[in-house]
């Protein structure tokens, strides 16, 4: 297993890199979030990596942070999500944004990523619920979402309200409110809208 690579960045062509490590050039694919933070060609670079061995190829994927690599590893465990699709997900949104989308069960945000349809987005939400969101928390600058708010959101979605309507209604519910009272207050807010 190759867990990390450090060398000189020889070539950048999104999403591919060529990293010279003691005279050996390694081809590494990276998500765009990592690509945008790379140094200039000719400069030293260090990446955390994940080696994928297939029957026809050995593929090396690189990441700027441990959270990106851990998220990639969780994504490729999901049936129907290969390394390329996982890379597309990480290129489409940051890890904290993905964690928030999963915590809030926002399939609509995931379907904006090229190659992710409604069914794939729902599978991602189902498979990663409790894994990614719990591990990574919330997006900095936004309030943390308590479990009761997620339960209220899921209840409103089950009643047929859109994600946008449900999220707006939950904002009207005071923090620390229980699930049952939260649903009542959210429904009251929705009836006034």
UniProtKB/Swiss-Prot annotation:
<dbReference type="InterPro" id="IPR013849">
    <property type="entry name" value="DNA_helicase_Holl-junc_RuvA_I"/>
</dbReference>
<dbReference type="GO" id="GO:0005524">
    <property type="term" value="F:ATP binding"/>
</dbReference>
<dbReference type="Pfam" id="PF14520">
    <property type="entry name" value="HHH_5"/>
</dbReference>
<feature type="region of interest" description="Domain I">
    <location>
        <begin position="1"/>
        <end position="64"/>
    </location>
</feature>
<keyword id="KW-0963">Cytoplasm</keyword>
<dbReference type="Pfam" id="PF01330">
    <property type="entry name" value="RuvA_N"/>
</dbReference>
<feature type="region of interest" description="Flexible linker">
    <location>
        <begin position="144"/>
        <end position="151"/>
    </location>
</feature>
<dbReference type="GO" id="GO:0048476">
    <property type="term" value="C:Holliday junction resolvase complex"/>
</dbReference>
<comment type="similarity">
    <text>Belongs to the RuvA family.</text>
</comment>
<dbReference type="GO" id="GO:0006281">
    <property type="term" value="P:DNA repair"/>
</dbReference>
<dbReference type="GO" id="GO:0009378">
    <property type="term" value="F:four-way junction helicase activity"/>
</dbReference>
<keyword id="KW-0227">DNA damage</keyword>
<dbReference type="InterPro" id="IPR010994">
    <property type="entry name" value="RuvA_2-like"/>
</dbReference>
<dbReference type="GO" id="GO:0009379">
    <property type="term" value="C:Holliday junction helicase complex"/>
</dbReference>
<feature type="region of interest" description="Domain II">
    <location>
        <begin position="65"/>
        <end position="143"/>
    </location>
</feature>
<feature type="region of interest" description="Domain III">
    <location>
        <begin position="151"/>
        <end position="193"/>
    </location>
</feature>
<dbReference type="InterPro" id="IPR003583">
    <property type="entry name" value="Hlx-hairpin-Hlx_DNA-bd_motif"/>
</dbReference>
<comment type="subunit">
    <text>Homotetramer. Forms an RuvA(8)-RuvB(12)-Holliday junction (HJ) complex. HJ DNA is sandwiched between 2 RuvA tetramers; dsDNA enters through RuvA and exits via RuvB. An RuvB hexamer assembles on each DNA strand where it exits the tetramer. Each RuvB hexamer is contacted by two RuvA subunits (via domain III) on 2 adjacent RuvB subunits; this complex drives branch migration. In the full resolvosome a probable DNA-RuvA(4)-RuvB(12)-RuvC(2) complex forms which resolves the HJ.</text>
</comment>
<keyword id="KW-0234">DNA repair</keyword>
<dbReference type="GO" id="GO:0006310">
    <property type="term" value="P:DNA recombination"/>
</dbReference>
<protein>
    <recommendedName>
        <fullName>Holliday junction branch migration complex subunit RuvA</fullName>
    </recommendedName>
</protein>
<dbReference type="GO" id="GO:0005737">
    <property type="term" value="C:cytoplasm"/>
</dbReference>
<dbReference type="InterPro" id="IPR011114">
    <property type="entry name" value="RuvA_C"/>
</dbReference>
<dbReference type="InterPro" id="IPR036267">
    <property type="entry name" value="RuvA_C_sf"/>
</dbReference>
<dbReference type="GO" id="GO:0000400">
    <property type="term" value="F:four-way junction DNA binding"/>
</dbReference>
<dbReference type="InterPro" id="IPR000085">
    <property type="entry name" value="RuvA"/>
</dbReference>
<comment type="function">
    <text>The RuvA-RuvB-RuvC complex processes Holliday junction (HJ) DNA during genetic recombination and DNA repair, while the RuvA-RuvB complex plays an important role in the rescue of blocked DNA replication forks via replication fork reversal (RFR). RuvA specifically binds to HJ cruciform DNA, conferring on it an open structure. The RuvB hexamer acts as an ATP-dependent pump, pulling dsDNA into and through the RuvAB complex. HJ branch migration allows RuvC to scan DNA until it finds its consensus sequence, where it cleaves and resolves the cruciform DNA.</text>
</comment>
<keyword id="KW-0238">DNA-binding</keyword>
<dbReference type="InterPro" id="IPR012340">
    <property type="entry name" value="NA-bd_OB-fold"/>
</dbReference>
<keyword id="KW-0233">DNA recombination</keyword>
<dbReference type="Pfam" id="PF07499">
    <property type="entry name" value="RuvA_C"/>
</dbReference>
């Amino acid at each position: 297993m190759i867990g990390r690579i450090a060398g000189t960045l020889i070539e950048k062509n999104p999403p591919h890199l060529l990293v010279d490590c003691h005279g050996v050039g390694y081809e590494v694919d990276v998500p765009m979030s990592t690509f945008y933070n790379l140094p200039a060609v000719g400069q030293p670079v260090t990446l955390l990596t994940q080696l994928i061995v297939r029957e026809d190829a050995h593929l090396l994927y690189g990441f700027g942070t441990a959270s990106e690599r851990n998220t990639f590893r969780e994504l490729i465990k999901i049936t129907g999500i290969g390394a390329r699709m996982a890379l597309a997900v990480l290129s489409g949104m940051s890890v904290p944004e993905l964690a928030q989308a999963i915590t809030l069960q926002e399939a609509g945000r995931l379907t904006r990523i090229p190659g992710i349809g409604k069914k794939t987005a729902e599978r991602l939400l189902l498979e990663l619920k409790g894994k990614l969101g719990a591990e990574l928390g919330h997006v900095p600058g936004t309030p943390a979402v308590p479990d009761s708010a997620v339960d209220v959101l899921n209840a409103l979605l089950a009643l047929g309200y859109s994600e946008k309507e449900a999220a707006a209604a939950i904002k009207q519910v005071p923090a620390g409110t229980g699930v049952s009272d939260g649903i009542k207050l959210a429904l009251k807010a929705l009836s006034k809208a």
